[in-house]
Amino acid sequence: MVAFLELTSDVSQPFVIPSLSPVSQPSSRKNSDANVDDLNLAIANAALLDASASSRSHSRKNSLSLL
């Protein structure tokens, strides 16, 4: 016996898996308890890493690169 899925235009409730849902509550999200100081520190660290990476990418004239 072959069964077919009947397609309709009826709107039903969405199927949501709570642990995987992209619209989960903020309390269940990872790092949701980070405070402003933690975020500012992360932004400052990212800026420092970016600045040091760009300064290392420019080699000096007439010098040998070890990388």
Swiss-Prot record:
What does it do?
Required for efficient sporulation.
GO biological-process terms attached to the record: ascospore formation
Task: Explain the post-translational modification.
Answer: Phosphorylated during meiosis. During meiosis, exists in both unphosphorylated and phosphorylated forms with the highest degree of phosphorylation occurring in mid-meiosis.
Question: A Pfam family for this UniProt protein?
Answer: SPO24
- Which membrane topology term applies here? Peripheral membrane protein
Q: What is this protein called?
A: Sporulation protein 24
What is this protein's expression induced by?
A: By PDR1 through its PDRE-like promoter element.
Q: Name one GO cellular component term.
A: prospore membrane
| Organism of this sequence | Saccharomyces cerevisiae (strain ATCC 204508 / S288c) (Baker's yeast)
Q: What is the lineage of its organism?
A: Eukaryota, Fungi, Dikarya, Ascomycota, Saccharomycotina
Subcellular location, record wording? Prospore membrane
| Superkingdom | Eukaryota
Sites of the modification Phosphoserine?
S24, S32
Q: Summarize the record's disruption phenotype note.
A: Defective sporulation accompanied by the appearance of pseudohyphal-like projections.
Keywords associated with the record: Membrane, Phosphoprotein, Sporulation
